[in-house]
Design a protein with these regions (language model features):
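C-terminal output/effector regions of signal-responsive regulators
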Residues: 131-192
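Short hydrophobic/Thr-rich beta-strand motif most characteristic of the beta2 strand and flanking loop
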Residues: 27-35
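Conserved phosphotransfer microenvironments
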Residues: 16, 37-39, 48-69, 83-84
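Receiver (REC) domain switch/output surface
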Residues: 22, 109-121
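Conserved acidic segment of CheY-like receiver
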Residues: 2-14, 19-23, 50
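C-terminal output helix
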Residues: 86, 104-113
Length: 192
């Protein structure tokens, strides 16, 4: 795998240095950072991936992870000494790609990170696909609504209503969904 720019946030400075050395031996560049102000640190350093190590995740850290991963999604691996079911669910919901309990060994970190990156990429692809499907469905609904308005107002068949939308879109160099949204907006305005 290509070298990465990795942020390590660890309360234990000696352990952070050990992790840094292990990752740099693989050709990665590493930035060490405190756990405090994690969201801002991630925003500034723009790492390819982040590794957090702490005794236990607290609510503040989970909230900062949620903000940081929402702003700029990236693979995040968290190593903790202990975690309960609720903490694990909250961490995953906050965007953590992998949560490892009592398993921090420097020689395993890159392999765990690689798996987390692969999982993150698969999850991101699924998320993008879902967003695209939702957007397409929303466009389809607007087009159907606009066709209904044209069918009612101009006594057109469904096929002719669609052709009218398509012609208007082509004439104006716009997407059919944009023209349909204009039709719906005007119809809503005229109802008032």
């Amino acid at each position: 795998m290509a070298p990465l720019h990795i942020l390590i946030a660890d309360a234990d400075a000696a352990r952070a240095k050990t992790l840094q050395g292990s990752l740099e031996d693989n050709g990665d560049t590493v930035v060490l950072a405190p756990l405090a102000d994690l969201a801002m640190t991630l925003r500034r350093s723009k790492p390819d991936a982040a590794i957090l190590a702490t005794e236990a995740l607290d609510r503040r850290t989970i909230d900062e992870l949620r903000v940081a991963t929402k702003e700029a999604p990236r693979p995040v691996v968290v190593f903790v000494d202990r975690a309960d079911d609720t903490t694990m669910r909250d961490a995953i919901a906050a965007g953590v790609s992998s949560l490892v309990v009592a398993g921090l060994a420097p020689q395993r970190v890159r392999a765990i990170l690689d798996v987390a990156i692969a999982r993150f990429q698969a999850t991101e692809a699924t998320r993008v696909e879902l967003e695209t499907a939702r957007a397409n469905l929303a466009e389809r609904k607007v087009i159907d609504r606009a066709k209904g308005i044209l069918m009612q107002q101009r006594s057109l068949s469904e096929d002719d209503a669609y052709k009218a939308l398509r012609k208007e879109a082509m004439d104006r160099g716009r997407k059919i969904a944009d023209v349909a949204q204009s039709v719906v907006s005007v119809a809503d305005l005229l109802k008032r």
